Swiss-Prot record:
The name this protein goes by in its record: Enolase-phosphatase E1
Localization (cell): Cytoplasm; Nucleus
Quaternary structure and interacting proteins, as annotated: Monomer.
Gene Ontology annotations for the cellular component aspect, listed alphabetically: cytoplasm; nucleus
One of the Pfam families matching this protein, by short name: Hydrolase
Encoding gene (name): enoph1
Entry annotated with the keyword Metal-binding: yes
Amino acid sequence: MALFSVPPPVTVILLDIEGTTTPITFVKDVLFPYVKENIKKYLLEHWQEKECQEDVTQLQKQAEKDSHLDGFVPIPSGVSDNTTEHMIQAVVDNVYWQMSFDRKTTALKQLQGHMWRSAYISGQLKGEVYEDVVPSIRQWRELGIKLYIYSSGSIDAQKLLFGYSIEGDLLKLLDGHFDTNIGHKVESKSYRNIADNIGCLPENILFLTDVVKEALAAEKAGLHVAVVVRPGNAALTDEDKSNCCCITSFHQIHFPSQK
């Protein structure tokens, strides 16, 4: 297994999640199906709670905006002739419709996030990480390396995944989190913003991601980069392979101070 020698200036590792620390199938094959299979039960159990009603209100507002779309599913306002059962079924149908088109509306993401939080806390869901991830980040921390997450998923969602993982609570191994509020992952400025936020130079950061466009944006900002190749990730072209340093496991990351 070829080693990736980390340049001496690096004191920070910035990690992507999907396809890097976590199987890319986790969201598609675990998180999304959980919502579809449990949304009605969740709404029945939490319907009277303020948070749930706020989620429904946001979905109703989104439904009004979507009324011009083909096949859109309405959610009636809470007038007296609409029973709770009828309202819940309307919300379920609307969520199914949105998810069938892989939509990312704020209202949908908010409800999904609350459902996942409940499932993580109750133990119904566990965040998945590749087997090489935890031993590697523990070793890096022993070397004094700081570790941050940068994902398109919200910081709250990141903390749930790592806080309730199959390997236990991993948040204590991480120094911080970034999401797209710091900037989009394919824009170089985002990586300079992250360096400024951490309080280091771009050249002090090694970014690990499975997405070549993100790697090139980070590299343009002055970061060191390795593209992580995992089963199920998007295939790399020959040009990608020639332009990027590639690894298949975190175990290939080697620091000068390691024996």
